[in-house]
Amino acid sequence: MSTLHKVKAYFGMAPMEDYDDEYYDDRGPSRGYSRPRFEDDYGRYEGRDFEDPRRDPRAGMRADLRGEPADYPPPGGYRGGYPDEARFQPREFDRADMARPRFGSWLRNPTRGSLAMDPRRMAMMFEEGHPLSKITTLRPKDYSEARTIGERFRDGTPVIMDLVSMDNADAKRLVDFAAGLAFALRGSFDKVATKVFLLSPADVDVTPEERRRIAETGFYAYQ
């Protein structure tokens, strides 16, 4: 466009369709749907990328070539019904070697293994001539029976003190008395069970094993 035409167009002396400039787009809008000037390619996709691999038998082959796991079932469709056999079979625990022992067996054999003691040795501990053969068990009800304990121990008799039936205050006083008595007469004072103590004279040597056996085999039988 010449300079004259530009001047005419500027003052309205020339038709607008004759005005041509690189900054002006004289093309009118096209009829119908027009594609946006700035398109976003993120929304574009091809249908074959979203095909169900279960319907396409070639999808598993493509997954193997790409190194991707194909965790979908093979083609063939859904198989109804249940399998003939259960997948997990119940285990049987009714074997003879796993039978539970009877209650009486635990009472007859309270100790097993290395702690078990020969019954013959246990009988020898209380036979005539053994220091523990004259052992006695006292079950005081209150602190007033401390005199009886002291007299038995002074005569050289091992004494088992069962303080289970006493209250804690009197039991503590009697324990202090027995400990002082054993110290004065050069004896020994040992605990064999809960609130049960053994007073041994100086000439009676009671080993830890014997004390444990006294507690396990029933010191209540020795009065």
UniProtKB/Swiss-Prot annotation:
<dbReference type="InterPro" id="IPR007561">
    <property type="entry name" value="Cell_div_SepF/SepF-rel"/>
</dbReference>
<comment type="function">
    <text>Cell division protein that is part of the divisome complex and is recruited early to the Z-ring. Probably stimulates Z-ring formation, perhaps through the cross-linking of FtsZ protofilaments. Its function overlaps with FtsA.</text>
</comment>
<comment type="similarity">
    <text>Belongs to the SepF family.</text>
</comment>
<dbReference type="GO" id="GO:0005737">
    <property type="term" value="C:cytoplasm"/>
</dbReference>
<keyword id="KW-0717">Septation</keyword>
<dbReference type="InterPro" id="IPR023052">
    <property type="entry name" value="Cell_div_SepF"/>
</dbReference>
<comment type="subunit">
    <text>Homodimer. Interacts with FtsZ.</text>
</comment>
<keyword id="KW-0132">Cell division</keyword>
<dbReference type="GO" id="GO:0043093">
    <property type="term" value="P:FtsZ-dependent cytokinesis"/>
</dbReference>
<feature type="compositionally biased region" description="Basic and acidic residues">
    <location>
        <begin position="36"/>
        <end position="69"/>
    </location>
</feature>
<keyword id="KW-0131">Cell cycle</keyword>
<dbReference type="Pfam" id="PF04472">
    <property type="entry name" value="SepF"/>
</dbReference>
<protein>
    <recommendedName>
        <fullName>Cell division protein SepF</fullName>
    </recommendedName>
</protein>
<dbReference type="InterPro" id="IPR038594">
    <property type="entry name" value="SepF-like_sf"/>
</dbReference>
<feature type="region of interest" description="Disordered">
    <location>
        <begin position="19"/>
        <end position="81"/>
    </location>
</feature>
<dbReference type="GO" id="GO:0000917">
    <property type="term" value="P:division septum assembly"/>
</dbReference>
<keyword id="KW-0963">Cytoplasm</keyword>
